[in-house]
Amino acid sequence: MSVLQVLHIPDERLRKVAKPVEEVNAEIQRIVDDMFETMYAEEGIGLAATQVDIHQRIIVIDVSENRDERLVLINPELLEKSGETGIEEGCLSIPEQRALVPRAEKVKIRALDRDGKPFELEAEGLLAICIQHEMDHLVGKLFMDYLSPLKQQRIRQKVEKLDRLKARA
């Protein structure tokens, strides 16, 4: 397994729409494993393949405190959503920035697991929010897209400054 490079805004590759996975095979499983390693290394709770420049419909999530409840979503589809909620969301592609984003409180999805087996899942709370956040990535949407143009500009400037400082270090 290896840690992959996470793309940061304003990288336009984050805006690409991911293509469906045609077959869950050893290559896809390796990508899933690398994505988990990357997510844990970056201290995230979710990661979409788009964020690591792989434009396939793959998401990994682990919202557990002990980091031992891996959830793999390949070709996820949103079946139902209900309620309204929101928390201050962060994103590995938008480092050190957070914003309140409106989300559905509960979701029902269908996806394939790491072995290519179909399943349905009903989620609420943090897991539901994380699923929606990561599914947005698969269509090229970022949490900051829900914000005003002024807030988006401020976030972009802060991230670009942070990346410049890290490049010098």
From Swiss-Prot:
Reaction(s) catalysed by this chain's protein: N-terminal N-formyl-L-methionyl-[peptide] + H2O = N-terminal L-methionyl-[peptide] + formate
Major enzyme class: hydrolase
PANTHER family assigned to the protein according to its UniProt record, in alphabetical order: PEPTIDE DEFORMYLASE
Species classification: Bacteria, Pseudomonadati, Pseudomonadota, Gammaproteobacteria, Enterobacterales
Keywords in alphabetical order: Hydrolase, Iron, Metal-binding, Protein biosynthesis
The name this protein goes by in its record: Peptide deformylase
Keyword Iron found: yes
Active site (catalytic residues): E134
Pfam families, sorted: Pep_deformylase
List of residues binding Fe cation: C91, H133, H137
Documented EC number(s): 3.5.1.88
InterPro entries: Peptide_deformylase, Peptide_deformylase_sf
Listed GO MF terms: metal ion binding; peptide deformylase activity
